[in-house]
Design a protein with these regions (language model features):
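Short, flexible, mixed-charge glycine/proline-rich loop motifs
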Residues: 1-6, 33-36
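A detector for short metal-coordination/catalytic motifs
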Residues: 38-39, 46-89
């Protein structure tokens, strides 16, 4: 996952530091999200805190660092990760 996003925040495209990086659940766990690769992206801990239980796309589109290109990369990650690890054999 970190390589997919070039060791950068999935939302801001800023290089992540070890001290401030975390994993955001695209669909929050308390909103019926699951702890699987296709539901997770790397981001800054402060962005994860700000997003909280909000819808990812709704929250992200309101941020000053919003990028349609990054949003598409997030959706491409979801599709790739689900194809690789999510399908039952």
């Amino acid at each position: 996952m970190m390589c997919w996003f070039d060791w950068k925040c999935a939302y801001s495209n800023t290089p992540l530091t070890k001290e401030r990086r975390t994993i955001d659940h695209i669909i929050p766990l308390n909103n019926m999200g699951i702890n699987e690769p296709w539901n997770c992206v790397p981001c800054f801990d402060s962005y994860n805190y700000q997003k909280n239980t909000n819808d990812m796309e709704e929250w992200y589109s309101q941020q000053p660092y919003f990028s349609e290109e990054r949003l598409n990369k997030i959706y491409a990650w979801i599709e790739y990760a689900y194809e690789k690890w999510g399908k039952e054999e």
